[in-house]
Design a protein with these regions (language model features):
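One-carbon transfer enzymes
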Residues: 1-215
Length: 215
């Protein structure tokens, strides 16, 4: 309901693994997550042992909450992105509540996860300017863009023997999918934001490329 009807934005288009330099020939293990007690998932034992014992670091994407001994098997653990400042905005959807609350910035966190929700060590954290973002989708795009450089920075930090990652000082409120009046707020802000975005594009000064004088 919150995704807004329309085509999938370009920043969410999937990229086939075989098209990515450096990992096209990587081994792939297809598996079904094993439900953990309470909440979250485990990796199947055989996959956990094979990957964990032969990997320097794992990056979790689209696997839900991952728990269990596997988190400590890779040399540098398991990393996960959180689109939000863990001391202010936890839960989901990332960036949505910052949009509804008219925040000027939104956080992005790369964390080494453990069994406690959102309590793992922070490897890299950053914030993006969203003061002029007219829709949640625009906030989401900016947060995802920030993740690219953060992953490279995080790997470099993990390779640095002098770097010490630390857990968050405190954890903020846990947000969930909005309902009731919050959905109406979202619809209203999105409608207004789209209109403002169109006017901003129309009023933007036209830029022209000029030839620099030769020396």
């Amino acid at each position: 309901m919150l995704r807004q009807f329309g085509p999938t934005p370009e920043y969410q288009w999937p990229t086939p693994i075989e098209d990515i330099d450096g990992v096209a020939d990587a081994d792939r293990f297809h598996c079904e997550p094993v439900p953990a007690a309470g909440f979250g998932n485990h990796l199947p034992t055989d996959v956990a042992e094979t990957v964990g014992e032969n990997t320097d670091v794992v990056v979790r994407f689209g696997f839900g909450v991952l728990k269990g001994e596997f988190l400590e098997m890779p040399t540098h653990g398991v990393l996960s992105f959180h689109r939000g400042d863990l001391e202010s905005y936890r839960g989901q959807p990332g960036g949505l509540w910052e949009f509804l609350n008219d925040e000027p910035t939104a956080g992005v966190t790369l964390q080494r996860i453990d069994d406690d929700l959102d309590a793992g060590e922070i490897v890299v954290e950053d914030e993006v300017d969203i003061a002029d973002a007219h829709t949640w989708r625009e906030i989401e795009r900016r947060q995802i863009e920030a993740c690219v450089e953060m992953l490279a920075a995080g790997i470099e930090r993990l390779r640095d023997p002098d770097h010490e990652s630390t857990p968050p000082d405190s954890l903020g409120s846990l947000y969930t999918i909005p309902s009731g009046t919050d959905v109406l707020r979202y619809v209203g802000k999105t409608a207004v934001g789209r209109v403002r975005s169109r006017y901003a594009e129309r009023d933007a000064p036209e830029t022209r490329r000029t030839r620099q004088p030769s020396e």
